């Protein structure tokens, strides 16, 4: 039996292929609505799996085309991140037989596909070598994450990164090697090998500092049109992926343009800082609040996610400072959107966990440099 899957995000099509490749279905793919209509006429598939939000011809256009072409001979399954009931009703009225809301597990997608085509249900048992698919999820959004790396050869938690991209089919991790003098580049290339759809390596031959590494990574990732959001995360995973995913959920369900983690110590949270580091952080934060004119609790947490608009407009020019580029991002947003509007576009989300990892590159000496860089930012405003 033939299945045609249509989605403008290649990572979603790859996930569908992973879900169904161990079945007897003949799989075909289309990258947009126009191609889906053309392949539908060519292939006459038994099932079409279609996304609603595609450029040009939308999923609704595809539904209408199928409905008017073959009098219900082809089953149609909508797979979308849209959770509005009115959208779902509209899809069913347009001819959809099934509506799957993302995020959705690969095993659930496989079972629903087999059921709609009246095929034997093939559920992978816990003893199956491929049972790992049970925990793999097609995410609602496609998110690119820039991870700057400098001399991380011995610290990089490769297995943690592997497990994350295996379970979360909607993330692409871009590791930026910032001119490392050890074997970091080799470690990163080995990590990406065989996982090119989900992990890439961007190599900067010379060390330019964290700010420039993140900027180069963002500019590289923005070229990928499938990404709904782009963010960055420290390589030591002081902020873990669970908290980062919370940032993504926040921005995707709001009008915020950028959401950052906030290391606020509170009941129920595991926020661990060295005593001296905590004191300096508070001092720096007071200075930042005065510079920005905004009541931030924590601008310097290395976990943030943003819209494509912010990624495209706020990373064009190099940053003046190495450690305080987060502050410069907010200043650029303030200048671009205006002081009155910008505070409605920025969100701080408290983290559940943040741990100062051994071997962190930020030292007491660096903290003094940060204060000096704050003064540079202050003078550059005048």
Q: Where do the PLM segments sit?
A:
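Two-component/phosphorelay signaling modules centered on CheY-like receiver
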Residues: 10-28
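Receiver (REC) domain active-site loop signature in two-component systems and cognate sites
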Residues: 54
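Alpha4 helix (beta4-alpha4-beta5 surface) of REC/receiver domains from two-component response regulators
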Residues: 61, 83-98
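C-terminal output helix
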Residues: 86, 104-113
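Acceptor/aglycone-binding surface of glycosyltransferases and processive sugar-polymer synthases
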Residues: 202-220, 229, 241-323, 357-365
